[in-house]
Design a protein with these regions (language model features):
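Surface-exposed loop/turn positions
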Residues: 134, 220-221
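Conserved N-terminal segment of class I S-adenosyl-L-methionine
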Residues: 1-197, 207-210, 289-292, 298-305, ...
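A short His-aromatic
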Residues: 198-202
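S-adenosyl-L-methionine-dependent methyltransferase catalytic module, highlighting the catalytic core
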Residues: 13-16, 68, 204-215, 222-329
Length: 333
């Protein structure tokens, strides 16, 4: 199989946008169309070397094929450092993309089992941060993996997702999941925690999402977010052009962490996300550096499974992903 990069973005509508953290329009280009095309080809080669030639096309999802097309251009805000697509896909097309996906039940069940193991560590970290248990809402609950992990830690979490197909699957496993987006969700009670894992960077309007989370939380509630680090992407791209050796290392770090081709709308850094949260009524409790969850499966070559176990933890020095925990600031008297 070979990738058809000539069709990138050909069926999408775009619009120019400003930085959603500071509102600025003064940016530096991080990657242009030719850069993204080169990265896409490098990403394809990276995974084709590590996967069996018999890998089903559907198992390439979130490796070389993503819900959104690769960006035309990636920029970095000169003021706050946010990395983002500009131009960006229009909101209505983004929503249609995520609501229309209908994976097979076997694929959803395999994802649920694999992701539940990964999410156990996040559920335990959440317990340590809050030093108590209570109620929570996971935004972008997808196959219900975190809901299962949270239940094991004796938390009562509900799910929220825009995709009715995956929501029906999660409900079939015994979880409470709502068909809605965060901005328009009207629950009957407030939550102790709102968790947004691996979804915040894909939302149409992260600023509006933070406001909504603030509205849904108790006065001392906590917002927990996990995102890819846009600063890491920009920094390693800049380093990669200085020599062939550095390009090889940089692309390997980015590929191991799903940052190559920047398959996200927004790439926050700890500093830019802290600024956004503080502006919207939260006090940051802490930031935890992280890496992409393991992706090796039964289609991964044996040497590549070992490589991922050994190499991926070493990439944490670049903080390719991070979690941030923030407490809802009490309203002024």
């Amino acid at each position: 199989m070979t990738p058809k990069w000539s069709t990138i973005g050909s069926h999408s509508s775009y619009e120019l946008t400003r930085c959603i953290v500071c509102g600025g329009a003064d940016t530096l280009e991080v990657a242009g169309p030719s850069d993204i095309r080169e990265e896409a080809e490098a990403l394809w080669g990276f995974h084709m070397r590590r996967l069996s030639p018999h890998t089903p096309p559907e198992r390439l999802v979130d490796r070389v094929a993503f819900s959104q097309a690769p960006p035309w251009r990636v920029v970095r805000c000169r003021d706050c450092g946010l990395v983002y697509r500009n131009p960006m896909e229009k909101r209505e097309e983004l929503c249609a993309t995520y609501t229309s996906e209908t994976p097979e039940r076997d694929a959803l069940l395999a994802l649920h089992r694999a992701q539940t193991r990964t999410y156990r560590a996040q559920a335990r970290r959440l317990v340590r941060r809050l030093e108590r248990r209570g109620t929570g809402l996971e935004v972008g609950s997808y196959v219900g993996a975190f809901l299962a992990a949270a239940r094991r830690e004796r938390w009562h979490f509900e799910g929220l997702d825009v995709n009715p197909h995956t929501n029906a699957f999660a409900r079939s496993l015994g979880f409470t999941v709502h068909d809605a987006d965060l901005e328009h969700f009207e629950p009957s009670h407030p939550f102790d925690v709102v968790a947004i894992w691996n979804t915040f960077d894909q939302l149409p309007d992260p600023r509006a999402a933070v406001r909504a989370a603030h509205r849904l939380l108790r006065p001392d509630g906590v917002l927990a977010v996990r995102v890819p680090n846009g600063e890491c992407y920009a920094r390693l791209r800049a380093v990669s052009v200085t020599s062939a050796e550095r390009m090889s290392v940089s692309r390997a770090v980015l590929a191991h962490n799903n940052l190559l081709t920047f398959p996200y709308r927004f790439g926050f850094s700890p500093a830019s996300l802290t600024r956004l949260l503080r502006d919207l009524g939260f006090d940051v409790m802490g930031v935890i550096p992280d890496v992409l969850v393991p992706t090796a499966d039964e289609w991964t070559r044996r040497w590549a499974v070992v490589e991922e176990r050994l190499v991926k933890p070493l990439t944490k020095r670049w903080t390719p992903w991070f979690e941030i925990y923030a407490r809802r600031r009490p309203a002024a008297a």
